[in-house]
Amino acid sequence: MKKVLVFLWAAVILAAGAFAAVRYFVPEKAEPAKSGGSDLLVSITDQKLMTAYYENQNKLYEEKMTDYPAMALDRKKRILYYTNTDNSNVKHLIRLDLQSGKKTTLYSGDEYVDGLSLSADGSKLFMRYNLAEERNFHLASFDLKQKAFHVIYPSLKNKDKSVSYYQYNKANNRFVILHYSLKEDYQKTDEANSKGVPPEPTNMNISLADVKGQEKVRTIAKFINDTAISPDGKTIVFTESADDQKAIYAMDAETKKYKAIISDQRAFSLVDSAQPQFSKDGKKLYFLAEAKDAKLLEDETGSEARVRTIYSYDMDTKKVSKAWEKTNGIINTFTVIDE
């Protein structure tokens, strides 16, 4: 089931136990981006398995890692939303008021959620959503007032289609979704195992959707791990990883033609899911990679991973620059949070 938990790609995904250690950092106001770049929300886990949430260079909060972290930030109200798991394997969706330090548990249960995004009006959280007894993931919303989930795609009746990644576009209140067939995926995996060869890539579908419907853009038979769309909706990007070669592709949303724009270079190597994301003006593309001289870290369980860096790629000049890095931990995920 190589795509069922597609967000769990980092070596830092470990059984960390109870979250006894907690540190809260009082931010007076939103932290501005440095050097004219985009504002970033970053989740990073250190060698002691403490997961910290940063708004640019400002540490908002940290606690012991209990599961792969998901997060979203309401910059106007100064609210951090994040997830954790307790010793009984119960999942929690937490609301943290960054001004008062007050925590509110919005949801507790068996459902698994990740990939949090805050709606443009701040009334909902979007996420990948998985029922405990099911194998496929859905794109869903959580109403912050009613405290209720609503499945967007695919329907709960559909047990085959699974959302492996999505991105929410605040500019037009739409989504770009990466999804595939579980049946096809298992079939290709079983065939490869029986022949003793690597599996052929499952057909990955890239679709655009809103809360009411979905339209397919293109089906691509590649090992695709993520996707994103430009603010104007004209360019879709995705990361492909195959045979130790990784690249970020840009696809024209109208013609459906695509080409590689970023690949491994002397200075860095892309990670399996580079999490590409556009700046608000669409002029820069941010992504995750490992610098060639990246420090190797070992956590308290003995697991090793290299430090990751967030880079920016100028869509006009093609220049790549470092945007965010800390050498004492591994970046789990990040979000461009330009207002």
Stretch-by-stretch model annotation:
Residues 7-20:
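Hydrophobic membrane-insertion alpha-helices, especially the h-region
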Residues 22, 26-61:
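An edge-strand/N-cap motif at the start of beta-rich repeat modules
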Residues 29-36, 71-79, 116-124, 166-175, ...:
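Blade-terminus and WD-like Trp-Asp/Gly-His loop motifs, strongest in beta-propeller folds
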Residues 40-44, 80-83, 124-128, 175-179, ...:
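Residue position within the beta-strands of beta-propeller blades
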Residues 52-69, 95-112, 142-163, 209-225, ...:
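Multi-bladed beta-propeller domains
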Residues 85, 130-131, 178-200, 288-306:
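Short, conserved, GDST-rich strand-edge loop motifs in beta-rich repeat architectures
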Residues 90-92, 136-138, 201-205, 245-247, ...:
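A detector of repeated loop/turn-to-beta-strand junctions in beta-rich toroidal repeat architectures
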Residues 150-152, 156-222:
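Solenoidal tandem-repeat scaffolds enriched in leucines and small polar residues
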